Amino acid sequence: MSKIIGIDLGTTNSCVAVMEGGEPKVIPNPEGNRTTPSVVAFKNEERQVGEVAKRQAITNPNTIMSVKRHMGTDYKVEVEGKDYTPQEISAIILQNLKASAEAYLGETVTKAVITVPAYFNDAERQATKDAGRIAGLEVERIINEPTAAALAYGLEKQDEEQKILVYDLGGGTFDVSILELADGTFEVISTAGDNRLGGDDFDQVIIDHLVAEFKKENNIDLSQDKMALQRLKDAAEKAKKDLSGVTQTQISLPFISAGAAGPLHLELTLTRAKFEELSAGLVERTLEPTRRALKDAGFAPSELDKVILVGGSTRIPAVQEAIKRETGKEPYKGVNPDEVVALGAAVQGGVLTGDVEGVLLLDVTPLSLGIETMGGVFTKLIERNTTIPTSKSQVFSTAADNQPAVDIHVLQGERPMSADNKTLGRFQLTDLPPAPRGIPQIEVTFDIDANGIVNVRAKDLGTSKEQAITIQSSSGLSDEEVERMVQEAEANADADQKRKEEVELRNEADQLVFQTDKVVKDLEGKVDAAEVAKATEAKEALQAAIEKNELEEIRAKKDALQEIVQQLTVKLYEQAQAAAGQAEGAEGAQDAGAKKDNVVDAEFEEVKEDK
């Protein structure tokens, strides 16, 4: 069976891993890095992904970051006259990770396990699945990030019974899950989180502080200057990372703006204490879901065996201190917070292919599911933290006499009134026979699959008429839209490959021109002038083709010049060897002569000893 890769599709960084020899291994990208920034840039119809896209974000307004925060919404971003959905941008990142995996494994990759925040709702999960399809991947399973982290952590510790808390603070989302590990079973007991809290918010408090300080000093609002804002974002991210290791850092941004007197510079020292003061509210926001998860699980903090930190933002000292204070446990440092989720996704891929045996994963639904009933009340059918996959049915009736149809309004959330919860979808069960209210028996069944994706059906028990829906929110994509995006993504991948080959061809041609000049110079006066003229002529023909940008002509002229240069290079080596041989011969003769010249005539006198 072909390999199933594990992908952590993160808000700020993404990572891909695979099972090899019974161990999950992170796959480096072409630059040799183990994580790839979740950044996509467009420049003259060319798409750039990762570090190269992030580096030019300051000067390129067509750079898209943190798109994960918009998954499952109807958000669109316009780039070069075309609208892109979050699914399409995520698919570009996934294509890049897929290509890294294929280069590493030396085979085509078509299947993946992709992780999502535990607190992602149905629409966000469906959007992630669609992104995988657009990227040319069969998404075998969607699993929750804290659960994946627990899988990677617990793979070697299946014999130990443990209660663990996974605290996952990523770039854009926060999750906390409580799990029990025993005999290869990873059972999620409870989960809680905040999908609008992460490292980006910690960056933002630094940015706001810098903007306020600069405005106080110069009366200029940098938040209105797009390019200055991007520089501030880069500086804030760097300062945040620095302050995990040192107690203060210098932020220096020369020529950030201009005033009446000339250019203005931003120079500021940020201490760890000031950063902790600025971000105290954010750290506190992570503790409420932590307490809720513990309460839902019915555990006291003292019952926990391990606290595992996941996500780059957990490197912030104030975050580590807060979770230590809350649980009374020193956080476990034996996993890499940037990689552990992808490693866990790879383990789940191994479970699905049969490469990993004896592991059973029992996850939960993060939010309650139900329908709207009379008076706008939210009636729950499946409570949050129910183990999935699961199915639950309940019988409802009509609210009016001779009602011909019922509207089924499907919701997800924890509030008592429907209006305060998230609508997942609506559908109708029609052609009900006339009857007094309260008489028809309508059975509503909710199914949640292992990916956390919801199916709902309604059945009139009197007539056996049934209506079903796979939840597709207003932001969801139809099969036709996904198919169109798949084709566009494939076409773009081909175009990107073609552009890469064109760039490589031009680089090779330029290199050959330089090499020709060097060889001709080295052979000056040593070979027939006609041969040198032939090489020069072929070189000039290639230069003309490069200037015209005629790719086929460049290829033909390059091949012709390559042959001539190879012949000249052979002659260059032959001459060098001949010269070396002559030099050795001359040296040998010289040594012999030297020995002859150095012969000293000495007088010999025999001395006889008297006996």
UniProtKB/Swiss-Prot annotation:
One Pfam family in the UniProt entry: HSP70
CDD domains reported for this sequence: ASKHA_NBD_HSP70_DnaK-like
Expression triggers: By stress conditions e.g. heat shock.
Keywords noted in UniProt: ATP-binding, Chaperone, Nucleotide-binding, Phosphoprotein, Stress response
An MF annotation (GO) of this entry: unfolded protein binding
Chain positions covered by the region annotation Disordered: 577-598
Gene3D superfamilies associated with the record: 1.20.1270.10, 3.30.420.40, Actin, Chain A, domain 4 (3.90.640.10), Substrate Binding Domain Of DNAk, Chain A, domain 1 (2.60.34.10)
Domain of life, per lineage: Bacteria
Extent of Low complexity compositional bias: 577-592
Disulphide bond pairs: none
Residues modified to Phosphothreonine: 173
Family indicated by similarity: Belongs to the heat shock protein 70 family.
Job of this protein: Acts as a chaperone.
Name by which UniProt lists this protein: Chaperone protein DnaK
Native source organism of the sequence: Bacillus anthracis
